[in-house]
């Protein structure tokens, strides 16, 4: 996906009721963010958010947080959610965050996340960029710091030679 600077994206994100601002403050208290205290699943690098919006609709008994680090991409997810809500779909079990995934242990306590989704993340194919991959040892260690005892990381890749 080609990233473009979208004027007003940052302001729209800051003003959105669907985006958790200052997520570090919520550490250990994510159950209070949602209407109901339920298992928490996150998607790291959610893109335009379609996958999570579908899950949130199909599984109202699970809370979801979509994590994206690029304003322009997160804005598209917000616009899609607003469009769906205008058409009568309610997502009280879904929020978004604009944050770098390297900060996950500063945002979630150990045992706060039940499942992590990684869908078609940037493969960073060059060897010198291996640490940037969301499936690198460094990132897997971060996930371990926030998952419940038997938590899961589910990922889909488009490049099988990594």
In which residue ranges do the predicted regions lie?
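Class I SAM-dependent methyltransferase "Motif I" SAM/SAH-binding loop
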Residues: 44-47
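A short glycine-rich, Lys/Arg-flanked "PGG" loop and its adjoining helix->strand segment in the class I
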Residues: 135-149
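Conserved small/polar residues in nucleotide/adenosyl-binding loops
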Residues: 161-162
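Conserved SAM/SAH-binding beta-strand->alpha-helix loop
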Residues: 70
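S-adenosyl-L-methionine
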Residues: 1-40, 50-57, 81-110
